[in-house]
């Protein structure tokens, strides 16, 4: 596979950007491919190599690249302007549509990224409760702000240790950690810090270490325990919102949090974040209350237009039914390949079909178990997949995604590429 132009661009990029990229996950070794264009389920690099895209920009593109309805909506909005600095009608329309599927978001705030959404939700929880401590799940990723940049799986301690230079220990000393799928660890932590904890923030389905599904009744138990200890529950649905179902993971599992964060799919491929929840909590947010949050690009009409167009397609075209049918067939095919090769490996998860990953090891249930998989073998597998024309996210702990745009031919090529790649790394 020829990648000369990508290699040249990477050399130039290294003189411009830290590590040659604008986000660390893109720093593929020895160099990343540089994208020229993308359409539907395919992405093409500057050297003319075309790949079936199962990364899909790390989750936002459930309709695929450049869906006609989304492009048409953006084009129409551009004719009316791309940024106002005032409220707009699209905010009201899209806000009502969000509430239709996430009724627990009784009031909400449009922001620009998932990071901003989780930061706003945590700040609102702290402001509402008057408490400083928060709990997060080991291995859970909630953006790049200081309070949640805590090293996961840090041995026996639950006290936060910064996972980035530049984050003061004093900032994260109020960030506690518990393992996923362990209700007893959560109870013990809440008991040990009774009346000190503002909130638990968690991905209901762990999207940044797998994905990994909740055990039966785990989320319901989390909801009950947080209520018992008067701790607010935040579901970070930046990945799972509009992905697990149109109602998100909270609708899929029937568990309503106090606060929700959305992003990715909710922006239709443009930058967005949303946080919202119970009316009494959200009324502490400025200008109604004393919890400050603001932004020049909040409520950006282009992002809201793209997001609303995406959700309308999800409604009209039974997207989840179609994508899940593809995903279930793919899961079975990949599982059969792994078993046929007698490899120690798992295709996870088994129940949510548009999200999947291959683990070379036992089925993980939490971050500590996920870390024990054979990451070196995954890296080799990933390289073979790219050579075979399929682009998976380059990290073992990221999630592969399917979209409406993936055709039957795409699915067959993914299976063929996996069979060749798995055989090569056996």
UniProtKB/Swiss-Prot annotation:
EC numbers for this chain: 5.4.3.8
GO biological process: protoporphyrinogen IX biosynthetic process
Gene3D superfamilies (UniProt xref): Aspartate Aminotransferase, domain 1, Type I PLP-dependent aspartate aminotransferase-like (Major domain)
GO cellular component: cytoplasm
Catalytic activity as recorded in UniProt: (S)-4-amino-5-oxopentanoate = 5-aminolevulinate
Pfam family, one: Aminotran_3
GO MF term list: glutamate-1-semialdehyde 2,1-aminomutase activity; pyridoxal phosphate binding; transaminase activity
InterPro entries xrefs: 4pyrrol_synth_GluAld_NH2Trfase, Aminotrans_3, Aminotrans_3_PPA_site, PyrdxlP-dep_Trfase, PyrdxlP-dep_Trfase_major, PyrdxlP-dep_Trfase_small
Cofactor annotation: pyridoxal 5'-phosphate
Record PROSITE patterns: AA_TRANSFER_CLASS_3 (PS00600)
Pathway given in the UniProt record: Porphyrin-containing compound metabolism; protoporphyrin-IX biosynthesis; 5-aminolevulinate from L-glutamyl-tRNA(Glu): step 2/2
Subcellular location field: Cytoplasm
Main location: cytoplasm
Modification N6-(pyridoxal phosphate)lysine, positions: 264
Keywords: Cytoplasm, Isomerase, Porphyrin biosynthesis, Pyridoxal phosphate
HAMAP family: HemL_aminotrans_3 (MF_00375)
Family of the protein in this entry: Belongs to the class-III pyridoxal-phosphate-dependent aminotransferase family. HemL subfamily.
UniProt protein name: Glutamate-1-semialdehyde 2,1-aminomutase
Gene name of the encoded protein: hemL
